[in-house]
Amino acid sequence: WLLDISFKKGDVIYIQKKNNNYIINQEPKVNGAIIVLDPYTGDVLALSGGYSFKKSEFNRVTQAKRQPGSAFKPIVYLAALNEGYSPATLILDAPYVVDQGPGLPKWKPSNYTDEFYGLTTMRTGIEKSRNLMTVRLANRIGMNKILSMANNFDINEGLDENLSMSLGSGVVTLIELTKAYAIIANGGKKIEPKLITSIYSKDGNKIYDTRL
């Protein structure tokens, strides 16, 4: 249900060959970031904090605080499972309105499709990333339980106790979010991202190894 409009037919991207690899040869208008993490060992297999360290030393993996959006929803559903809910639990997918107080507009979250689906299982809710189900579920179990679950994944900052947090309106770093997903993939066992796995002396002798 997502449409990728980043590229279209006829677009030209300039690249150059370097050391048997191809790299982009034009400066992008925006910077991105990526981290590849082994969920079982914590080893960082790849990391790029931006297009050019020379042009910007700001590391967008470890320093940039960004809204995770729907990527935060698994934390909500894990909190629900921890409270006794199951994948088969039915949650109403219907309009939801929050009164934010005097002088403030009412908050009316919506699904990506702008449609409503009635009673739906939690499993479908996370699978289809349903906003209205997630907000209703968050209100039912309490945002304090969700923030507590986030803390279990070492996401401790940038979150407030309001319902919009359940849809990822807080801020996290990419490495924090990736670590949280790694913990899920690792069956709930916590890991720490390791940027260095071993160090060798100039003579080739190993003087440090994270596995020892």
Where are these regions (language model features)?
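A short, well-structured edge-of-sheet supersecondary motif
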Residues: Q26-K54, M149, L195-S201
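Conserved catalytic neighborhood of penicillin-recognizing serine enzymes
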Residues: Y40, Y85-I146, K190, K202-L212
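Short, charged, amphipathic alpha-helices and their helix-cap/turn boundaries
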Residues: I141-E157
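Active-site-proximal helix/loop microenvironment
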Residues: N152-I207
